[in-house]
Design a protein with these regions (language model features):
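A short helix-coil junction within the Rossmann-fold of NAD(P)-dependent oxidoreductases
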Residues: 1-2, 18, 45-60
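Substrate-binding pocket helix/loop in short-chain dehydrogenase/reductase
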Residues: 19-20, 27-32, 132
Length: 176
């Protein structure tokens, strides 16, 4: 196994966009299992490993949960996704309080829609692209390197007093 673990970037997620009244138990379970249960279990395993390090209090540690701007707002046809991302924001806060005594910081990074091959088909639909871009005051999608830079910052000593909070990278979506 790993000799030590200092940083976890906990990133898992899926969405099945559909109206609230049409969500099946199967789809609810699929999204909850990946977006909440898997992230919980990965964090739990990582913390167990982190706590095995004898000098943890002086060495420190960081858990970075990748959530979404949707963990701070609501949106139509994204009820289950919003529910799960709000849950991880809550997990982030609870773990930050519980793990502070071990000098393990727990934060989240909450990006807006990102320009990736996975989102490309969604933005090929003009009505969806307009709906999203109309809600981002900066008028553009996020880039992966912007999220990566945030991860580097939150994992670093530059963020040594930052715990229990969310770094929202959304071009102003949640500011409205």
């Amino acid at each position: 196994g790993l000799p030590a673990l200092d940083v976890l970037v906990n990133n898992a997620g899926m969405n099945i966009p559909e109206p609230f009244v049409e969500v099946s138990e199967e789809n609810l379970d699929r999204v909850l299992d990946l977006n909440v249960r898997a992230m919980f279990l990965v964090a739990q395993a990582a913390v167990k490993k982190m706590l095995q390090t004898p000098d943890r209090k002086t060495r420190g540690g960081a858990i970075i949960n990748i959530t979404s701007q949707m963990g701070h707002v609501g949106a139509p046809a994204r009820t289950v996704y919003c529910l799960t991302k709000h849950a991880i924001e809550g997990l982030t806060k609870a773990l930050a309080v519980e793990l502070a005594m071990y000098n393990i910081r727990v934060n989240s990074i909450a990006p807006t829609f990102l320009d990736t091959p996975m989102t490309e088909p969604m933005f090929a639909r003009p009505e969806f692209a307009k709906w999203v871009l109309d809600r981002i005051p900066m008028g553009r999608l996020g880039q992966l390197d912007e999220v990566a830079a945030a991860v580097v910052f939150v994992a670093s000593e530059a963020a040594s007093l930052m715990t229990g909070t969310s770094l929202v990278i959304d071009g102003g979506w949640t500011a409205q």
